[in-house]
C-alpha cells in the first residue's frame, strides 16, 4: 500500500464514512465530523454538511510543506473519497488548534443553504466565515438543553446563530432572550427562528455586550446557556475578555440572573481551560464533557461542558 499522504487520507476518510454511516442513518444525522486530525502528518478537520464538505487546515510548524497546491490536492481527494462533487468541498486555512473558534468573514459568496438536525432546520454557510453557523460538537448538548426547556424562561449568551435557542423554543420554552454583539449573527439567529416558525415576540434577540447585559438586566431566567469565546477584544466590548481569567465573574453574573434551582449549561473550546468550581458558589456542578461528546468526535478535549445548578 502506498504511503502517499493523499492515499492515506482517502483511505481514512472512506473507513470513517463507512463506520459512521449506520449511526448517521439511525440518528438521522446529516451533518457530522468524518476526520479530525486522525493522521498526525495531515492536520485537517473534515465535516460533512449534507452533500457538502467543510475542510479546515490547521497551522503547524512544518507548514511550508502545505502550500496552496497541497491544500487543493487534499480538497479534491476528500471530495472524491466521500463521493461529493468537488465544487461542494470548501478548504480553509485556520490558525490555532482544532476546537478554537474564530468569528470573522473570509469571503462574500452569500452561499447559504439549509440543513436539518434533531428535527430542526438551520442555515449554514461554509464559505464566507471561519465557522459555518452550526457547531457540530454541540449536537448532543443542544438536545440536552432542549429536553430541559419546556415551560422555562431561557437565556442564551454569546448566542452566535441561535441554534440553542431554536432547540429551547421548539421544546416549549415560554420565552427566550438571545444575546450577542454581532449584528450579522443575530440576524442569522433570527433567520433560524423563522425557518422553524419560532419568530414570535416572546423570543427576543438582543445586541449587547454580555457582561453589560447581565449587569443591567433584572429579568429572571430558569435555564441558560453560556458558550463564550476564549478571548475577545472586540471594539464594541467595554473590556477585553480572557475566559480563563474572567470565567468566575462571568458564570457568577449569569447565575445571579437565574431563579433558585435554575440551570446553567457552560461550555468552552479552550483546550487548557480549568474551571474554578470552588469560587462559583453553585449548588451543584456536573462535568458532562464526555457525556455530551457526539459519536463522531473522538477527542475528549474538543470542548468542555458543565451543568451548573444555582
Which positions does each model-derived feature cover?
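S-adenosyl-L-methionine
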Residues: 181-225
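Non-catalytic substrate-recognition/targeting regions of SAM-dependent transferases
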Residues: 40, 44-47, 70-135, 143
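C-terminal catalytic and target-recognition region of SAM-dependent MTase-like enzymes
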Residues: 263-310
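Conserved SAM-binding motif I beta-strand of class I
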Residues: 175-180
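Mobile active-site "lid"/loop adjacent to the S-adenosyl-L-methionine
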Residues: 185, 207, 221-253
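Non-catalytic accessory regions of SAM-dependent methyltransferases
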Residues: 1-52, 58
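Conserved class I S-adenosyl-L-methionine
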Residues: 151-160
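Conserved SAM-binding loop of SAM-dependent methyltransferases across substrates and taxa
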Residues: 161-173
Amino acid at each position: 500500500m502506498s504511503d502517499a499522504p493523499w492515499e492515506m487520507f482517502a483511505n481514512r476518510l472512506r473507513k470513517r464514512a463507512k463506520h459512521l454511516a449506520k449511526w448517521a442513518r439511525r440518528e438521522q444525522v446529516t451533518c457530522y465530523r468524518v476526520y479530525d486530525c486522525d493522521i498526525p502528518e495531515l492536520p485537517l478537520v473534515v465535516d460533512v454538511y449534507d452533500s457538502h464538505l467543510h475542510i479546515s487546515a490547521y497551522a503547524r510548524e512544518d507548514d511550508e510543506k502545505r502550500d496552496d497546491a497541497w491544500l487543493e490536492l487534499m480538497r479534491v481527494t476528500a471530495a472524491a473519497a466521500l463521493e461529493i462533487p468537488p465544487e461542494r468541498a470548501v478548504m480553509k486555512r485556520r490558525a490555532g488548534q482544532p476546537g478554537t473558534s474564530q468569528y470573522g468573514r473570509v469571503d462574500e459568496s452569500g452561499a447559504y443553504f439549509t440543513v436539518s438536525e434533531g428535527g430542526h432546520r438551520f442555515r449554514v454557510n461554509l464559505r464566507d466565515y471561519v465557522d459555518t453557523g452550526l457547531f457540530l460538537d454541540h449536537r448532543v448538548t443542544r438536545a440536552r438543553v432542549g429536553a430541559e426547556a419546556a415551560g422555562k424562561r431561557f437565556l442564551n449568551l454569546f448566542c452566535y446563530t441561535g441554534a440553542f435557542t431554536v432547540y429551547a423554543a421548539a421544546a416549549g420554552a415560554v420565552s427566550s432572550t438571545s444575546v450577542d454583539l454581532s449584528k450579522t449573527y443575530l440576524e442569522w439567529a433570527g433567520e433560524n427562528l423563522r425557518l422553524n416558525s419560532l419568530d414570535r415576540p416572546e423570543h427576543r434577540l438582543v445586541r449587547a455586550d454580555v457582561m453589560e447585559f447581565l449587569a443591567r438586566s433584572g429579568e429572571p431566567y430558569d435555564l441558560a446557556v453560556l458558550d463564550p469565546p476564549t478571548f475577545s477584544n472586540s471594539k464594541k466590548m467595554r473590556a477585553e475578555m480572557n475566559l480563563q481569567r474572567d470565567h468566575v465573574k462571568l458564570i457568577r453574573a449569569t447565575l445571579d440572573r437565574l431563579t433558585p434551582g435554575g440551570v446553567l449549561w457552560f461550555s468552552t473550546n479552550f483546550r487548557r481551560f480549568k474551571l474554578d468550581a470552588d469560587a462559583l458558589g453553585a449548588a451543584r456542578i456536573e462535568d458532562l464533557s464526555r457525556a455530551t461528546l457526539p459519536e463522531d468526535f473522538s477527542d475528549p478535549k474538543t470542548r468542555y461542558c458543565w451543568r451548573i445548578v444555582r
